[in-house]
Structure formats: C-alpha cells, structure tokens
Amino acid sequence: MLNTTPINIDAWLAENSHLLQPPVNNFCLHRGGFTVMLVGGPNERTDYHVNPTPEWFYQKTGAMTLRIVDEQLSGAARFRDVTIREGDSFLLPANVPHNPVRYADTVGIVVEQDRPAGHFDQLRWYCRGCRELVCKYEFYMSDLSSQVREGIERFAASAEDRVCKHCGTLNYPTPQASAT
C-alpha cells in the first residue's frame, strides 16, 4: 500500500528526539530507494564514512561541521572542514570520506541512496597523531539505522585496530579533549 501520510518534522522531534542517541544520533524516517534520516547532536564518533553514492545534507537547526578527506591532495592538506549552517544544504559526492560533527541542540536531515549491488561502504579511522589510515571496515550497507553504530562499537572493542601502525598512537572511537 502506498504511504500517503506526511510527517511533520517539528512534531516528530517534539515527541521523539530521545531516539536520536549516540554515537550516530540518527533515526530513519523513510526507506525505499532512498533513506531519509533525522540526525541530532551532539554525536560521538571519530570515523570517516565512505559512501559509494552521494549524500544530501540539510541543516534544519544550528550548524554542523562535515570533516572530509580530499584524496586528490596529500598530507594534512587533504583534511578539510565544511561548515553547514542552519538552512544550508550540501551535496557530498560519492566516495568522499567524511566525519559529520554535530553539536548540542542541532538537527539535520540526511538523504542517502540505497546501495547498488556490489557497491560497499567503508568506515575509516585516521590517526589523530600522524593522520595516516589506522583502520578500515568494508561492508554492504543494508541498514543505516544500525550498521554504522555496529562498526563504531567494533572499533571501540579492538585496541589492536585502534593503534596506528605508523606512529603507535592509540586512537579512540569517540572524540577526546586532546584529539586534533
């Protein structure tokens, strides 16, 4: 049966904002061809997600920082921050590593395409000391409401995965006061 019931976002948030929980703080409103998510802040994650399809961001309340890795550059210059302010939309191209940083009392909407067969997502962690790749998990994304969280929990549970092979720095699944 065709769903013809609109969702009032403000009313939904007033009743359900408690569902936006760390580390990802997302709730999937719609699925089927695309997934439409509400995402609140603050979130608690240090991973960079690599999506084989584009992602559309709309910042409803407050501002967020989208940390990206421009793989056409080298060294520290490849790490860039994109500020998405209240009312802004931003289309992130496919295959760009990104870490959404959401602050307290902020809400955004993110739209992602369903993944084509044979296309895989990645969660990556870069060393907070030397910025080299520390760990990478690759998987077929079938459930945005759980798989990113599960990857973060897997990284948190493995001290071996969190130690940089280049400089020996221990990395964390959540932001630390001393993290760069």
From Swiss-Prot:
GO function terms (MF aspect) = 3-hydroxyanthranilate 3,4-dioxygenase activity; ferrous iron binding
**Do you know which InterPro entries this protein is assigned to?**
3hydroanth_dOase (IPR010329), RmlC-like_jellyroll (IPR014710), RmlC_Cupin_sf (IPR011051)
Q: Which GO terms describe its biological process?
A: 'de novo' NAD biosynthetic process from L-tryptophan; anthranilate metabolic process; L-tryptophan catabolic process; quinolinate biosynthetic process; quinolinate metabolic process
Q: Which gene encodes it?
A: BNA1
Taxonomic lineage is: Eukaryota, Fungi, Dikarya, Ascomycota, Saccharomycotina
| Functional pathway | Cofactor biosynthesis; NAD(+) biosynthesis; quinolinate from L-kynurenine: step 3/3
Residue positions binding a divalent metal cation: C127, C130, C164, C167
Q: What class of enzyme is it?
A: oxidoreductase
Protein purpose: Catalyzes the oxidative ring opening of 3-hydroxyanthranilate to 2-amino-3-carboxymuconate semialdehyde, which spontaneously cyclizes to quinolinate.
Residues reported in the UniProt entry to bind O2: R45
Q: Which domain of life is it from?
A: Eukaryota
The record's comment on protein family reads: Belongs to the 3-HAO family.
Binding residues for substrate = E55, R102, E112
Pfam annotation, one family: 3-HAO
Q: Which coarse location class describes where this protein primarily resides?
A: cytoplasm
One GO cellular component term noted in the UniProt record for this chain: cytoplasm
Q: What is its EC number?
A: 1.13.11.6
> Needs which cofactor?
Fe(2+)
Q: Which HAMAP family match?
A: 3_HAO
Give residues annotated as binding Fe cation. H49, E55, H98
What is this protein's record name? 3-hydroxyanthranilate 3,4-dioxygenase
